[in-house]
Amino acid sequence: MRCPSCSHNGTRVLDSRPVDEGRSIRRRRECESCLSRFTTFERVEESPLIVVKKEGTREEFNKEKILRGLIKACEKRPVSLRQLEEVTQSVERELRNLGISEVKSDMIGEIVMEELRDIDDVAYVRFASVYRQFKDLNVFIEELKDILQKERE
C-alpha cells in the first residue's frame, strides 16, 4: 500500500477490524518510511446491479437515488437520516440477496415502501403517492384505508 504522505510503498498494518456489518475491513496503517498513519478500507467488489425502468431502459443501481427519495418523503417528519440510510442499506442488501443481476424498478419501489411503512405512515403515503402515481383521489383514499386497516390488526 502506498503512503498518502510520502508515496513510499512499504506500510504495515497496525489494526484491522470488520465494519459495515462485516462487509468491509477497516485497517489502520503506518508508513515504514515517514511513520505517517492512515486508514484504509477493504471490501469485496460486488457485481453491478442493473435496474430495468418502466420504459425498458436500463441503468446501474444507485442507492443515493433511493436515499434522496426517502429524504423527500420524510421532510418535516421525525425520521433521522441514520434511519433512512439503514433503510437504503436494507433495500440494497435485499436486492443483492435475490442473486439476480437485473431488477425491475417496480420491485425496488415496493421494497422501499414496505420498509418505510414500518417507520412513518405519513412518509409512506408521501412516497407511495409519488411512486404509484395515484390517478385520482379514490385510489389515494383506498391506500389510506389499507394503512388504517393494518394498524388495527
UniProtKB/Swiss-Prot annotation:
Domain called ATP-cone: residue spans: 49-139
Per its UniProt record, what InterPro entries does this chain match?
ATP-cone_dom, NrdR-like_N, RNR_NrdR-like
Q: Which cofactor does it need?
A: Zn(2+)
How is the cofactor bound, as the UniProt entry phrases it? Binds 1 zinc ion.
Q: A biological process (GO) annotation for this entry? A: negative regulation of DNA-templated transcription
Report keywords, A-Z: ATP-binding, DNA-binding, Metal-binding, Nucleotide-binding, Repressor, Transcription, Transcription regulation, Zinc, Zinc-finger
- UniProt superkingdom: Bacteria
Which family does the entry's similarity section mention? Belongs to the NrdR family.
Q: What is this protein called?
A: Transcriptional repressor NrdR
Q: Which species does this protein come from?
A: Bacillus cereus (strain ATCC 14579 / DSM 31 / CCUG 7414 / JCM 2152 / NBRC 15305 / NCIMB 9373 / NCTC 2599 / NRRL B-3711)
